Amino acid sequence: MDGEQRGRSDRPGGSPHLPFLSNPLMGDVVSDWSPLHDAAIHGCLLTLRNLISQGWPVNIITADHVSPLHEACLRGHLSCASVLLSHGAQVNGMTIDWRTPLFNACVSGSQDCVNLLLQHGATPHPETELASPIHEAAKRGYVKCIESLAAHGANIDYNISHLGTPLYVACKNQQVACAKKLLESGVSVNQGKGLDSPLHVVARMSSVELVHLLMDFGANAQAKNADGKRPVDLVPLESPLIQIFLQNEGPQSLRQLCRLRIRKCFGIRQHHKISELLLPEDLKRFLLHL
């Protein structure tokens, strides 16, 4: 409740006593879950301000190194995250499983929190492969988070051994909008997880829309994975994709080859660069896959 002074020291100017409380997100595990964490995760801004004014440290962490900022971002509470950062919260603090506030913001899908953290110096590049913000956003279908991360220099082709590229993750989770945004931004259409390409994974799932999308961006339908299988070899026999692959076995049209070559020359952030070309609108729309 707002105004409640749990754990406040009775001494004037004294530091608050930090009790051990049960973290509701950790089951029966007991951790140093503080009222500050509780206010942050529930978005109780007034309570958060009161606790900070009473002397609660904004960088107090649980046994798992979870900070109030982690919790505010996990639930997408922008105002709480802003207050914590303005009082010195560590923007790149990591939990014991390597999660940063930025990773948690991508879990919640809050572009506002992502932008706030990046503006305060959050790094879009994870220190380990275990908690990549851009992969998490791709997995959950948060296009806006991907846009913000890419705009701040995140590697949109970041290849993690156990996950693959963001495009591969988006395709595996059938996040069409994210896959399209990544392709429009200039990712490599054939980079996936090891020798398993994005086209392999969508063929395996018999996703017609994603197969069309990847082929439209030049996916190699003849590439073989570690088992020597082409994407068409992974398609269920009853799937209509069999016919689609057969229709695309021949060479690509000159028009398609020209589009792919032009887009490759522009590299990343292609939409912005192509839009500024002095070309007829119809041609620009073709280059942009619109």
From Swiss-Prot:
InterPro entries: Ankyrin-SOCS_box_domain, Ankyrin_rpt, Ankyrin_rpt-contain_sf, SOCS_box, SOCS_box-like_dom_sf
Pfam families: Ank, Ank_2, SOCS_box
GO molecular function terms listed in the Swiss-Prot or TrEMBL record: ubiquitin-like ligase-substrate adaptor activity
Compartments (UniProt record): Mitochondrion
Chain positions of ANK repeats: 31-60, 64-93, 97-126, 129-158, 162-191, 194-223
Disordered, as annotated region: 1-20
Main location (coarse class): mitochondrion
Regions of compositional bias (Basic and acidic residues) in chain numbering: 1-11
Modified residues (N-acetylmethionine): 1
Entry GO terms, CC: Cul5-RING ubiquitin ligase complex; mitochondrion
This protein's UniProt keywords: Acetylation, ANK repeat, Mitochondrion, Repeat, Ubl conjugation pathway
Gene3D superfamilies linked: Ankyrin repeat-containing domain, SOCS box
Pathway the protein takes part in: Protein modification; protein ubiquitination
Record site feature (Essential for binding to CKB), residues: 103
Location of the SOCS box domain: 236-290
Family according to the record: Belongs to the ankyrin SOCS box (ASB) family.
Described function: Substrate-recognition component of a cullin-5-RING E3 ubiquitin-protein ligase complex (ECS complex, also named CRL5 complex), which mediates the ubiquitination and subsequent proteasomal degradation of target proteins. The ECS(ASB9) complex catalyzes ubiquitination of creatine kinases CKB and CKMT1A.
Oligomeric form and interacting partners: Substrate-recognition component of the ECS(ASB9) complex, composed of ASB9, CUL5, ELOB, ELOC and RNF7/RBX2.
Name of the protein in its database record: Ankyrin repeat and SOCS box protein 9
Organism, as annotated: Mus musculus
Gene: Asb9
